[in-house]
Design a protein with these regions (language model features):
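Membrane-interfacial amphipathic/re-entrant helices at transmembrane-helix boundaries
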Residues: 1-49, 83-88, 159, 205, ...
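Short loop segments and helix-boundary regions at transmembrane helix junctions
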Residues: 1-3, 58-61, 99-144, 180-185, ...
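Cytosolic-side transmembrane-helix boundaries in multi-pass membrane proteins
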Residues: 1-20, 195, 202-209, 283-330
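Single transmembrane alpha-helix segments in multi-pass membrane proteins
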Residues: 18-82, 107-113, 252, 256-266, ...
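Inter-helical junctions in multi-pass inner-membrane proteins, predominant
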Residues: 25-37, 131-137, 156, 181-187, ...
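Helix-loop-helix "hairpin" substructures at the membrane interface of multi-pass membrane proteins
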Residues: 85-93, 99-104, 108, 159-236
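Transmembrane helix-bundle core of multi-pass membrane transporters
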Residues: 115-183, 210-213, 232-241, 292, ...
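Transmembrane alpha-helical segments in multi-pass inner-membrane proteins
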Residues: 215, 222, 232-298
Length: 330
């Protein structure tokens, strides 16, 4: 617990240092309004990264969420184009996202195949389905479906009490997932499943039901992100979530989640989302090409994984030495 809070404080300090450093290069980075409203460019990554944290804590992984976003976006456009009222179209899109998550969970549970392999397969399945629906809508390739009502396209660009709507939705998701993972019995079950699935099963923990809930929440969050992105850009495209995979997983791991399961932090992930998002924006404002920005995000992920692995092994060695000191061999 102490280590987790220490890591979160370190991330928060690093976030402040990052903003100040980029502010020295470009003073616009120090403008509060710019910092708040620029989150709309990347905060949907955070909306997906929060439930993804819980999936990884449980010992699983889901790399299909980017394709789920694209599929849900195209489905929303196709529903609207077919004359379905916008509120109903949004509801059906959210249900589709949850269904995609349940498909992942069902395949993982009943085939016992590694979640990485399953979600790699569904990544291509959902991406192909999105392109198929795009063709049905007459939007060839990565062309978008437009013509949405102004009330919908304005939604993601509104602000309430000085906060952009996407950021408000992210904060609501943050509160809900933090309470669920860290303050409920069901959340404790997620940690136990990640630490030892076999022990959790023998302890009468509903492992399969919990996994279904986690993957469904990730799919639902992907659908929420899709709706916000379509509203923000005013266009439904099958590639809307294509660039989400690397920054989302980087944020989860940087936030303190063990990639093998058993530990993680919703607050840590939230701070890491801002850290990664502002890193990319700061580099762009400094004139750094997007390719270099992506490479730095990948390098950051590698450094964090290696650093946490070294830290974990050092802690294990210290504990082993302490046990040896307290119980010397005869």
């Amino acid at each position: 617990m102490r280590i987790r809070y220490g890591w979160e404080l370190a991330l928060a300090a690093l976030l402040v240092i990052e903003i100040v450093a980029f502010g020295a290069i470009n003073p616009r980075m120090l403008d509060l309004n710019m910092l708040l409203f620029s989150t709309s460019d990347f905060i949907c990554i955070g909306i997906v990264a929060l439930p993804l944290t819980m999936v990884i804590v449980s010992g699983g992984i889901d790399i299909s969420f980017g394709s789920t976003i694209g599929l849900c976006a195209i489905a929303l456009g196709l529903l609207f184009q077919s004359g379905v009222p916008m509120p109903l179209a949004i509801l059906l899109t959210l249900l589709l996202g949850a269904l995609c998550g349940l498909i992942n969970a069902g395949l993982i549970i009943y085939t016992k195949v590694n979640p990485l392999v399953i979600t790699l397969g569904t990544l291509y399945l959902f991406a192909g389905s999105a392109l198929l629906l795009s063709g049905m809508a007459g939007a060839t390739g990565y062309e978008g479906i437009g013509g949405f009502p102004m009330a919908f396209t304005d939604f993601a660009n509104l602000d309430v009490l000085g906060l952009p709507v996407p950021l408000i939705i992210f904060l609501i998701c943050l509160l809900v997932f933090w309470l669920w993972l860290h303050k409920t019995h069901a959340g404790r079950n997620v940690f136990l499943i990640g630490q030892s699935p076999r022990v959790a099963l023998y302890s009468a923990i509903p492992v399969n039901r919990t996994l279904c809930a986690l993957y469904a929440m990730t799919g639902l969050a992907s659908a929420v992100a899709a709706v916000l992105l379509v509203s923000y850009f005013g266009s439904a495209r099958s590639d809307l979530g294509a660039s989400f995979l690397m920054p989302a997983i980087t944020a989860v791991v940087l936030g303190g989640a063990n990639i093998y399961g058993g530990s993680g932090s919703i607050i840590g992930t939230a701070i890491a989302v801002l850290l990664v998002g502002y890193l990319q924006q700061g580099l762009q404002m400094a004139g750094v090409p997007n390719q270099v920005s992506s490479a730095l995000s990948g390098a950051l992920l590698i450094v964090v994984v290696v650093g946490r692995s070294v830290s974990l092994h050092r802690q294990q060695i210290k504990e082993w030495l302490a046990r040896r000191a307290n119980n010397p061999l005869p």
